[in-house]
């Protein structure tokens, strides 16, 4: 069981699961390892399941994994899942053009542990603003489009497809996106319990190979992304409107990217410093405490027979 959320930052996971089943069915699989997708509604639920051992692997927020590892919870990041994919949305009829126009406004974020919040803080710092210059509201991402429509918030910062949902409906537009402002943005990372690493390294390696293969395949051509949308929209995975997922994949095509899954120490150090400044992590945590690079270093991207 591999846990994930119905967000496009997790799109490599449904592709990987279906690709492995296709390889087994075709008789081309190198091994019999199977990976079953388990959908969760929020990060706290995945966190609890990983901590309790109900699942052995899942996509998690990178700062949350850092914090868990620092608290001696036996988990390690073994791969990225994507890059970019967060947006700051405002109403189409609003006058906001510059980020600084949001001074004094109500802005929704998923949580203070979310990397979306760090993106927001990064944008604030560029304008010599602080979180005290806006009103921050924590809100589940699925509720954000309706809140913006009802004028309950002035803007929201979150991952896709919850920005695209409002944009496609016509009442919201993108003010800023990580694609333009934070190109190497990292949010969701593949996290595995240490006991699985110790007991079945080949299985973990196969999962990393599949995720890397899925990432390359997704970024290879638009037709592959169209196939991924059809897979992920199904009830066994995201159970979402395929038109909204398709919108994310096309507007623009690099709104979320998946091929570059390198784990670069300096990028994680930057993420940690931002988290410390935000108060969600209390002190620097050694890279090796929460990262196991061995699987990415040994990765051979799996063929995706879809």
Model-assigned labels for residue ranges:
Residues 80-82, 87, 231, 243-245, ...:
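Amphipathic, soluble alpha/beta structural segments
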Residues 18-20, 245, 287:
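Short, flexible, mixed-charge acidic loops at enzyme active sites
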Residues 63, 94, 137, 142-237:
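Pocket-lining segment of extracytoplasmic ligand-binding domains
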Residues 70-72, 89-90, 168-170, 187-189, ...:
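Short secondary-structure transition/capping segments
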Residues 1-130, 135-138, 154-161, 171-177, ...:
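Short, glycine-/small- and polar/acidic-enriched structural segments
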Residues 271-306:
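Conserved C-terminal helix/tail region of periplasmic/extracytoplasmic solute-binding proteins
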Residues 11, 15, 48, 52, ...:
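Solvent-exposed, polar/charged alpha-helical surfaces in well-ordered, non-transmembrane soluble domains
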Residues 198-283:
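Secondary-structure end/capping motifs
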């Amino acid at each position: 069981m591999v846990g994930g959320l119905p967000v496009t930052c997790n799109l490599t996971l449904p592709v990987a699961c279906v690709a492995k089943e296709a390889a087994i069915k075709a008789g081309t699989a190198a091994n019999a390892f199977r990976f079953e997708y388990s959908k969760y509604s929020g990060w706290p639920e995945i966190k609890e399941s990983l901590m309790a051992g109900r699942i052995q692997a899942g996509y998690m927020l990178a700062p949350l994994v850092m914090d868990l590892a620092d608290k001696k919870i036996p988990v390690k990041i073994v791969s990225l899942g994507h890059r970019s994919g967060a947006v700051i949305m405002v109403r189409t009829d609003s006058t906001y053009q510059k980020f600084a126009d949001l001074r004094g406004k109500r802005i929704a974020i998923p949580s203070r542990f979310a990397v979306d919040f760090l993106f927001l803080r990064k944008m604030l710092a560029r304008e010599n603003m602080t979180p005290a210059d806006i009103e921050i509201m924590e809100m589940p991402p699925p509720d954000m489009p309706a809140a913006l429509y009802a004028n309950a918030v002035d803007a929201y910062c979150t991952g896709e497809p919850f920005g695209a949902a409002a944009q496609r409906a016509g009442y919201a537009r993108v003010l800023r996106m990580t694609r333009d402002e934070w190109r190497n943005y990292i949010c969701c990372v593949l996290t595995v319990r240490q006991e699985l690493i110790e007991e079945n390294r080949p299985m973990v390696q196969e999962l990393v190979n599949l995720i890397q293969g899925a990432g390359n395949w997704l970024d290879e051509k638009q037709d592959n992304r169209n196939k991924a949308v059809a897979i992920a929209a199904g009830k066994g995975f995201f159970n979402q409107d395929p038109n909204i997922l398709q919108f994310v994949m096309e507007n623009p095509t690099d709104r979320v990217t998946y091929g570059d899954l390198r784990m670069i120490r300096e990028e994680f150090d930057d993420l940690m410093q931002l988290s410390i400044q935000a108060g969600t992590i209390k002190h620097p945590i050694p890279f090796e405490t929460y990262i196991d690079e061995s699987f990415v270093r040994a990765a051979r991207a799996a063929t995706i027979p879809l």
